[in-house]
């Protein structure tokens, strides 16, 4: 999930291959009766949570976006066939109650949950039950160009294309109203976990058809109708989003009556709003303010090793950066330890490989590029640029301006003159997705706990060809990508791990990026806010959050 942490989306899962069949009776635990709710738990219900983040989302259609800010809303509005248990990396049933996988790994059959209804809102008051036709619509609009829904060329299904889903899935069939069958072109080890990703959320076909018939297709991305624990109420762009509790949710009802998601670009302003009680929970604090926030009696700061990575993309298709010697020189010219001190106040681990060590398959034998200005200058000389060159770095006003200044100063020491170009968030995502940059900051939050989610989605040649791309380095190594494809087709985790270990060696040698940090998740909130978790795959889900009375 891009967010400069792209999610999008993402988060850890204990290999899909262990889940050949889910529980046949998940309703027993997913829908506890009122008699089973303790008096203490009943006290949790009610109240309004005010949550603040630094930037607004770009769409209410989860298939169109990769940025984590958009998923803050859509992740609470929509459901997927399977989901990740809150705060963990474990897969559990969602809109599918159970599934079977054929012995050859090519056929997945899902049994859908009955009695689930799409939201009724002020703009859509029809009571419609979820069924197989909605799954078909949600997938086929991304899979087939003839069923794209939006006007041709108007919108792009970035995640679908970047992950090569049309090459993975051969066909999708509705066997009846409550049974869906996926047939794959070949074994795909992460497939089950991928079905829990936000871009594969299930939308209402009836609602989409209604909008199409009334020439309002664009409203699908502005006024969502899902089956999730919260319903959409209001979106004032760059100001706030309001979500209301879905009283008819198929699973345990949310504790909160309402969630207000505010956009406050300045982190210090967010922190002040937290101090005064104007907001209750915030993301992206100024890390040099965390210590002071922890001293405030009614504020708690949750910290955890996250599933995040942050780096500097070097566009390998641009002049200078198409030379691996230049890319290595840049890596040796940047003191990453100092970068982490300046940017993260120590709330991060030094990045070495494309994904964090909290995911299996991490190559611990690879050592970071050492900070060595003499070596960096020598590499530039070997590349044919003894006096350096001029280039640019893309950043955003709210995301990483301090980091851009640090990189600019570092590269100046080896003769590289860097101009900083600042863009608003939406323009930044568009320009980097099209490859207009030479250098640009990027990041990723794991969508699933599988190396494939980082390596293939962000670094494969296939991803580089899907424009707009998540592969901001436009890295197109055949040797690297071939290993990733082989790993997809193997079900044994040890065999996959061996392939990923080799792939990490190749990308380290090619240096298409500057590894910077594995940031920690740091979330300040009022002490009365309970149940929010910074761990696991699905962050910023509010159905388990409550206000202590």
Q: Could you say what each language-model-derived stretch is?
A:
Residues 85-86, 166-167, 177-178, 188-254, ...:
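Gly/Pro-rich hinge or "lid" segments in bacterial periplasmic/extracellular proteins
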Residues 97-148, 181, 273:
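Aromatic- and charge-enriched surface segment that lines or borders ligand/interaction sites
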Residues 29-33, 189, 236, 245, ...:
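Detector for C-terminal structural segments
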Residues 50, 131-137, 177-183, 228-229, ...:
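Alpha-helical secondary-structure segments
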Residues 52-104, 140, 147, 225-227:
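N-terminal lobe/hinge region of extracytoplasmic solute-binding protein
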Residues 56-71, 95, 122-126, 191-201, ...:
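A structural "hinge/loop" feature
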